[in-house]
Amino acid sequence: MDKYAVIGNPVEHSLSPVIFQAFEKQTNHSFDYLKIKAPVNGFAAAVKKFHDEGGKGANITLPFKEEAYQLADKRSQEANEAHVASALQFREDGTIYAVNYDGLGLVQDLTRNHNITLTQKSILIVGAGGATRGILGPLLNAAPEKIVIVNRTPSKAHALAKIFHLRGEIQGGGFDELEPMRYDVIIHATSLGHQGKFPPLPDGLIGSQSCCYDLSYGKIASPFLQWAKDQGAKYNFDGLGMLVEHNAAVFYLWFGIYPDTNPVIEMLQAHL
């Protein structure tokens, strides 16, 4: 039986095996899907071992997305743009193909599942790490009015804005540089939720129709989403749908079939 996996560290709480099991039942495909916890300094060896043992593909989670991109022989446009990979495909000729579907998953979840319009909207992204880098391309493809990246270290936000500046109106800065305006969409892309915290955002960023979205899901997303509710945001979503939509795109890459994501999202929401 073909083998697939999610590779990360930590990986114990990954929902990807549950999602792929649901896709497996829905499409009548049979395969094994494993969780592989790779040592922080042993990612390449873990991938090689899985590949040598017949692995056909792998989802990549933290902290290995940049290393997965470097490991690949060929890469999708989205992966090249972001310099990160969210999934790998092991091809028949022995090469490794890298894709980055994080941004695709986010945009699909916002626009298709939640009916949020991104075109000609103002978007604030909180955080300038790999997660932000992975979503900027697809967000810019949606033709927003502008994107502002804010980060504790302003130079990182400025650097990201510079990389993508030819794609649309985009700027970066620190929290003290934030313009006093109300954004249509605010996306939280830091890891502070793991510590039960959220960034030092000022009041006055949220309007009556604003949408707030945390790339994390469950308890990790709670601090930011609670702040959003307290500030009066009309729409508040965590990243569970993004994860499912991302995995649906990966499933299509591996199997050539696009699964129905709605029942899977509903199933996960009922159990989380």
Swiss-Prot record:
Shikimate binds at S14, L15, S16, T61, D102, Y217. Keywords: Amino-acid biosynthesis, Aromatic amino acid biosynthesis, NADP, Oxidoreductase. CDD domains: NAD_bind_Shikimate_DH (cd01065). The keyword Amino-acid biosynthesis applies. Pathway: Metabolic intermediate biosynthesis; chorismate biosynthesis; chorismate from D-erythrose 4-phosphate and phosphoenolpyruvate: step 4/7. It catalyses: shikimate + NADP(+) = 3-dehydroshikimate + NADPH + H(+). InterPro entries: Aminoacid_DH-like_N_sf, NAD(P)-bd_dom_sf, Shikimate_DH, Shikimate_DH-bd_N, Shikimate_DH_fam, Shikm_DH/Glu-tRNA_Rdtase. GO terms for molecular function: NADP binding; shikimate 3-dehydrogenase (NADP+) activity. One of its GO terms (biological process) is chorismate biosynthetic process. This is Shikimate dehydrogenase (NADP(+)). It comes from Coxiella burnetii (strain RSA 493 / Nine Mile phase I).
